Amino acid sequence: MEADALSPVELGLLLLPFVVMLLAALCVRCRELPASYDSASTESLYPRSILIKPPQITVPRTPATSYPLVTSFPPLRQPDLLPIPRSPQPLGGSHRMPSSRQNSDDANSVASYENQEPARKNVDEDEDEDDYPEGYLVVLPDSSPAAVPVVSSAPVPSNPDLGDSAFSMESCEDYVNVPESEESAEASLDGSREYVNVSQDAQPVIRAELASVTSQEVEDEEEEDVDGEEAPDYENLQELN
């Protein structure tokens, strides 16, 4: 009578806690399934230990002697280990140089080329210094007084050696050959040298005197050649300026 008196609403309220508990248990079970499935899959791929049960071998008894049964087991084999995959290494990774190091190497190379030019200049200067002789010549300016006395009006004797002096004057040189005599010895530093320096003012006068002397000598030689019995076939004549 009491069961008939319960309405469907009251019956649903009584069963509601059981339904909620059942749903909660199912949800918890569903959450645990993926973790257990992952562990089972990894164990199936990488087995930790495989136990192989060897077959039992029985030895028959002999009639003469009685021995207990002896069971022999084959040696256990270690499970084959699967290779562990490794991450691929990049090719040529060790040969690459960082950009900062390359930039520093380029800078050092440019600096080395720039430093070579001053070194070459120094080498050239050293070579030029080596080319100079050991002794140095001291050049006096034109304004400084000459240490050698200047002979302006010296008697010029008629001597064939004066032809060489005329040639030297024509070549614009600053010295004149003087014959060995008392006057020339006094004029040439007490006879230590055979020539004296001539100033620029006295050069035209000496040139005129030497030219007149050489022309007179040439005329005398021509007269002697005409008067002589054996005359040379040819004769070199110096053109006088």
From Swiss-Prot:
InterPro entries (alphabetical): Linker_for_activat_Tcells_prot
Chief location bin: membrane
Name of the gene this protein is made from: Lat
Comp. bias (Acidic residues): 124-133, 217-233
Membrane topology according to the record: Single-pass type III membrane protein
Comp. bias (Polar residues): 97-115
Lipidation (S-palmitoyl cysteine): 27, 30
Localisation per UniProt entry: Cell membrane
Protein name: Linker for activation of T-cells family member 1
